[in-house]
Amino acid sequence: MIALIQRVTHASVRVGDEVTGEIGPGLLVLLGVEKDDDEQKANRLCERVLGYRIFSDEQGKMNLNVQQAGGSVLVVSQFTLPADTEKGLRPSFSRGAPPEQAQALYDYFVSRCRAAGMTTETGRFAADMQVSLTNDGPVTFWLQI
């Protein structure tokens, strides 16, 4: 399971004319699900995302996690993250989980964020979405379990 996390001052996702999720300061989480992923991996990744200390403390050091910084989370499904890009000029998506498994684990990941007390907004699984964000820093990390 892969999370590309970005520290943002604002982020939103829309499907057509509908805004399905919007946050102020916090984390935009692009979430990719691989074939061998399960709830245990989703739990570990959620703990890591929410605990990752990438927000500045009073001294300007990256020392606070999103909860300590008072932020929110916007989770967007991203089936291209597990792509195999090692050869050729076209990505292969054979590493990605089938849609039913991916959606179940995406929904589970979101539920774990909410259960941890995080204000959590989402995109719409498998929809064509437009994501807008203001990356703060920029600060972007690739987390993989």
Curated annotation (Swiss-Prot):
What top-tier enzyme class does this entry carry? hydrolase
Concerning InterPro entries, the annotation shows: Daa-tRNA_deacyls_DTD, DTD-like_sf
Q: Where is this motif: Gly-cisPro motif, important for rejection of L-amino acids?
A: 137-138
Instruction: Give the catalysed reaction(s), semicolon-separated.
Output: glycyl-tRNA(Ala) + H2O = tRNA(Ala) + glycine + H(+); a D-aminoacyl-tRNA + H2O = a tRNA + a D-alpha-amino acid + H(+)
Per UniProt, the keywords (alphabetical) are: Cytoplasm, Hydrolase, RNA-binding, tRNA-binding
Q: Taxonomically, which superkingdom?
A: Bacteria
What Gene3D superfamilies does the record point to? D-tyrosyl-tRNA(Tyr) deacylase
Name where it's found.
Answer: Cytoplasm
One GO BP annotation is: D-amino acid catabolic process
Q: Annotated Gene Ontology MF terms?
A: D-tyrosyl-tRNA(Tyr) deacylase activity; Gly-tRNA(Ala) deacylase activity; Ser(Gly)-tRNA(Ala) hydrolase activity; tRNA binding
* Enzyme Commission code(s) on record: 3.1.1.96
The record's section on Pfam families has: Tyr_Deacylase
Question: Which Gene Ontology cellular component terms are annotated?
Answer: cytoplasm
Report if keyword Coiled coil is assigned: no
What HAMAP family does its record include?
Deacylase_Dtd
The family database entries (PANTHER family) matched by this protein are listed as: D-AMINOACYL-TRNA DEACYLASE 1, D-TYROSYL-TRNA TYR DEACYLASE
Relate the protein's function as given in its record.
An aminoacyl-tRNA editing enzyme that deacylates mischarged D-aminoacyl-tRNAs. Also deacylates mischarged glycyl-tRNA(Ala), protecting cells against glycine mischarging by AlaRS. Acts via tRNA-based rather than protein-based catalysis; rejects L-amino acids rather than detecting D-amino acids in the active site. By recycling D-aminoacyl-tRNA to D-amino acids and free tRNA molecules, this enzyme counteracts the toxicity associated with the formation of D-aminoacyl-tRNA entities in vivo and helps enforce protein L-homochirality.
Assembly information from the UniProt record = Homodimer.
Per the similarity annotation, which family is this? Belongs to the DTD family.
Swiss-Prot/TrEMBL domain comment: A Gly-cisPro motif from one monomer fits into the active site of the other monomer to allow specific chiral rejection of L-amino acids.
Q: What is this protein called?
A: D-aminoacyl-tRNA deacylase
Q: What gene is behind this protein?
A: dtd
